[in-house]
Amino acid sequence: MERLKGKKQIEKLFVSGRSVGVFPLRLVFLKTEETNKVGVSVSKKNFKSAVNRNKIKRLLRIAVENHFLDLFNKLKPKYYMMVLYVGKEIPKAEELDTQFKLMVSRFNKKVLDEV
């Protein structure tokens, strides 16, 4: 699993991508010909302190590794994905994990409906 980097790729994702949301998370995804790439983002507007933003990003990356790794191996079309944290409080790891599972199941439904 690679990190989503580069202004053009991220811009393309937000302009043409689709999204799935489960508060406090939102997943924006776009089918692509390249490899699966994932990025995480936390709003500077909601979390002024870089320490808090980085803590949440760390939790998000762990959740991505735990829940998307199996899914990526099964997915035939490749995707660019961005996981956004839109909440206003620092989450507990267990709560984030539960919400992430729900978001992954909604993503699966949306992708399967597409095919």
Residue ranges: model-predicted function:
Residues 1-115:
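Positively charged, solvent-exposed patches that mediate nucleic-acid binding
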